[in-house]
């Protein structure tokens, strides 16, 4: 049986995550009281007619604070029943969360006459801290639209052909911010930039003219070889430490040329030696 626990601050995309999982065959339960997590796991194992072998639940800040504080203990009880449990934590910048609530005119569950929306968001962050600390996978939805979030969840949680650590090699542009869910970040902004070549500007690192240009630059080759050597040596150690997810982020200025080229090459090489390697270009 597989159990996915979805959590995160309000407005970060939990409902979308549950919709994706339900569309993928999961039996979904919204706003499960955290204290019922071990009981749910036990019932799912005993009564397979009632529940599917794939279950997803959301746990949010409407739970009793005492139950949220006990989340590490409750999760351990569920895992002790030999259930594959993945904790997905969604989040976004506070400014973006404020904007989303303003646009949708929804009420935050923790606001009241004495607590503003901004204060409610900060309180919620503290309440969900025990869950965030144990997340197997964190997804920052700050720069993701609805469709990108759906694709990201499918890529990271559902498209794993084999068990083991799931690796994501992701390109990004620093001008749109670093991905906060990255485990390893490599900055390639020091490399020659195709953007300043008028004939290359409108192309991306996926296009042959840019590939040919960057492949001919000695510094690009040196940078690629150094990053590749580091990852080939150390990523197996991450896998051996039972990490469920590892994200490697490669950043350049705009996320269109250098980072895309390096990410594509790294992804292709890592796929030859590691299982479950995915490639994503955040800003293309």
Swiss-Prot record:
Q: Which residues bind GTP?
A: 60-63
Tell me the domain of life: Bacteria
Q: Which residues are involved in binding ATP?
A: 8-15
Pfam families, sorted? PapZ_C, RapZ-like_N
Keyword set, alphabetical order: ATP-binding, GTP-binding, Nucleotide-binding
A single Gene Ontology MF term assigned here is: ATP binding
Which family is this protein grouped under?
Belongs to the RapZ-like family.
Describe the function of this protein.
Displays ATPase and GTPase activities.
Q: Which HAMAP family match?
A: RapZ_like
Please report the name of this protein according to its UniProt entry. Answer: Nucleotide-binding protein Pput_0988
